[in-house]
A protein has these predicted regions:
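Glycine-rich, charge-decorated loop segments at or immediately adjacent to ligand/cofactor-binding or catalytic sites
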Residues: 97-111
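Short, well-ordered alpha-helix to beta-strand connector turns
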Residues: 59-60, 107
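Conserved TIR/SEFIR loop-to-helix hotspot centered on a Trp-containing motif
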Residues: 68-85
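C-terminal helix of von Willebrand factor
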Residues: 109-123
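Conserved N-terminal substructure of TIR/SEFIR domains
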Residues: 1-58, 86-88, 94-95
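Structural motif corresponding to alpha-helix initiation and N-cap regions
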Residues: 46-49, 77, 113
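Short beta-alpha junction loops
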Residues: 69, 93-100
Length: 123
C-alpha cells in the first residue's frame, strides 16, 4: 500500500470511547488510514470552526460515528455539513451494535473492518 489516507472522525463527545476504539484501529501498522481528532470538551473557541474546516479540507474522507448522541451533537453536525460543503466523502459507521440511529444525509453502515476498509479504498 502506498500512503495512508487521512480520515477525519466526526463524533459526539459522549461517544469518545468508540472514537478511541477507531483510533486504536488506525494505529495498527496494517491500517490503511490515520485519523485526525478535533474533539473539544470545552465550548468552541472562536477559531475552532476555521481549524476544523482546514483539517477536513486536508482529509481524504470523513467517518462519522453515528449514535443517538449524534442527533444532539451540534459539533458533529457542523463537521458533517462542513465536509459536504468541501466535497469530502463521508461514511457513517454505527458506533454501537444496538443503536441504528438514522442521521439525515449520512449513508451509514455497520462497524466492521471491511466496511471501513472499503470506504477508505474508495477514496
Amino acid at each position: 500500500m502506498a500512503d495512508k489516507k487521512v480520515i477525519f472522525i466526526a463524533f459526539a463527545i459522549e461517544d469518545v470511547k468508540q472514537r478511541d476504539l477507531l483510533k486504536g484501529q488506525s494505529l495498527n501498522t496494517k491500517s490503511p488510514f490515520e485519523y485526525i481528532d478535533m474533539s473539544v470538551k470545552e465550548p468552541y473557541d472562536k477559531d475552532w470552526k476555521d481549524r476544523v474546516r482546514t483539517r477536513i479540507k486536508r482529509s481524504d474522507g470523513v467517518i462519522a460515528l453515528v449514535s443517538k448522541n449524534s442527533l444532539k451533537s451540534s459539533g458533529q453536525k457542523w463537521e458533517i455539513q462542513c465536509a459536504k460543503e468541501e466535497g469530502i466523502k463521508i461514511r457513517g459507521i454505527w458506533a454501537y451494535s444496538d443503536d441504528r440511529t438514522d442521521l439525515e444525509g449520512v449513508y451509514t453502515k455497520v462497524w466492521t473492518w471491511d466496511n471501513i476498509k472499503d470506504f477508505i479504498d474508495s477514496l
